[in-house]
Amino acid sequence: MTIEALADVVRLHPELALFAAIVFGHFIGKIEIRKVSLGTVVGTLIAGMILGLLFEPEIPDLLKWAFFDLFLFAVGYSAGPQFFASLKREALPQMALAVVVSCTGLAAAIAMVALFRFDPGLSAGLVSGSMTQSAALGSALSAIAAMDVDEATRALLTAHAPLADATTYIFGEVGLILFVTVVAPRLLKVDLRQVAREAEAELQARTDEDDAALWDQAPLSLRTYRLENAELDQRTVHEFERRYAAGRLTVTGIRRGDQLLRDVGADARLALGDIVLVASRRAGVVGAALEVGTEVDDQELLSEPMVRASIVLTRREMAGKTLGELARGAARGLFLDSLHRGESTLPRAMGTRVQRGDVFKLTGSRAAIATAARNLGFIEHDQGRTDLVYLAGGVVVGILFGLLQVRLTGVPLGLGTSGGVLVVGLVAGWLYSRYPVVGHIPEPALRLLSDVGLIVFIAAIGLAAGPHAVQAIHEGGIALFAKLVGAGVVVTLAGPIAGLLLGHYVLKLPPIALLPGIAGAQTTVATLNALKERGGSDVYAIGFTVPFAVSNVLITLWGPVIVACAVALSR
């Protein structure tokens, strides 16, 4: 098949080019140079521009913006609980850090636009690439689409945006990783691994080392033993569990003669000859077996159902407490598999503080799970089912909300449809975490909406920009790329430098909160992963979530702001 014949097929079926851009973009994004890769998003953008240049497929705007709206709603829904939690007094320092970093980045971008006279398209790509926020590219393109210009100019500006984004994105990610993991620790004179060890030691500190009612974190093991140790005769279950607190043993059932006791309470008494069902981590069971008695194979007891559940923390009085405080007297028989806040997995340490909207992945008996749900919030039922009415309705309300405008000195101001969908998504996610009656969207579905929504949008942008990219490169030449790279370096580093100074000297944030906070304020998950790798600990994730949620919103809104500034500066 000749290239002309292939081009004809692609023009008849433009979806071929769309999905091909995603496929080739994945492989382009995987190419590493000294352990640095472009990533799937930028790879797809580049692949889309190349395929667009070769085949010029016509991708409907409806498809592009529909997928982008789904992406924005998913981002807002995920970040909603953390965003509104950042408005609380204890989270204000982290919120202030995010605001300063993102606003400084915007100010630097405006300065670069004024200096180099970038048009609105280049300005949009400068912000989205330098601050590694692809959502800002979409919101800026939405603003460009609404500009009162001829179609040729709009097409050229639309091509300039992804070109500038791809040019500045590389340093936007790599530069921030180097700053946060190498430069900033040297300026602060700290060692990342030592900082992590100290934070872990503080989080693991307990007020009562003998307390048996603490979350277990190891793989669950169920065993049955005949009670033969006379010292344990007539002891309560609580005393038994306290005796073997180091092994985290929990008695979940007892056979006494022909009587089978399930959901045993802490005040129940043991007797010699009882068959006891214990749940624990494997090492704990093995250690206790030497004292308790002979292990027996009681299949009826061992069939005691242990269930897994995801419990969302919604009770106001529980928010702000540590895992140790929650566990004391309330976590008997529960095993904490993982703890999640938005897209981040938190350390399962006794000092980790929880917030409303956090998700506990627990294993335990039905009674223990039910008790935990009453104490913490609610169990996520129908975890594989998405409330499509809530999702679609949220997008509709967001678009309508974004269309609202007010006039300031004759200039129309508004969020735009992209900003409207994002804000409504934030509110929708927050409302569900508080009132989980309707609106459930499971985490896998959110990830799918976010990933597919963004990648399809980026592929469509690249395909549309491809035919105009050559003209943009021809007009700008090497000088344009040099200006973009230089401006990108300034915009990427301006915010983190300001954040480092503010966080260290004014907010007095410790490095364990400051460094991941800067990464979150620049919305760069890759930087958090680099921090965790160099620091050898997941504890850095705690300081990432609040700034990430706040800056996700702010930098997305910077898209139309930078377009408006570029238009104003060009007059």
Curated annotation (Swiss-Prot):
Main localization is: membrane
Record's superkingdom? Answer: Bacteria
Q: Could you tell me one molecular function GO term of this UniProt entry?
A: monoatomic cation transmembrane transporter activity
The set of disulfide-linked cysteines is: none
What are the record's GO terms for cellular component?
plasma membrane
Where does the RCK C-terminal domain start and stop, copy by copy?
294-378
Any one GO BP annotation for this protein: potassium ion transport
Keywords attached to this Swiss-Prot or TrEMBL record, sorted alphabetically, are:
Cell membrane, Membrane, Transmembrane, Transmembrane helix, Transport
Name the InterPro entries on file: AAE_transporter, RCK_C, RCK_C_sf, YidE_YbjL
Q: Does the keyword Transmembrane helix apply?
A: yes
What topology does the record note for this protein and the membrane? Multi-pass membrane protein
Compartments reported by the entry: Cell membrane
So where does this one cross the membrane?
A: 10-29, 36-55, 65-87, 96-118, 166-188, 388-406, 411-433, 446-465, 480-502, 509-531, 546-568
| Record bears the keyword Membrane | yes
Please give the family membership noted in the entry.
Belongs to the AAE transporter (TC 2.A.81) family.
Which PANTHER family does the record match to this protein? K(+)_H(+) ANTIPORTER SUBUNIT KHTT, PTHR30445:SF9
What protein name applies here?
Uncharacterized transporter BB1538
Species annotation: Bordetella bronchiseptica (strain ATCC BAA-588 / NCTC 13252 / RB50)
Lineage of producing organism: Bacteria, Pseudomonadati, Pseudomonadota, Betaproteobacteria, Burkholderiales
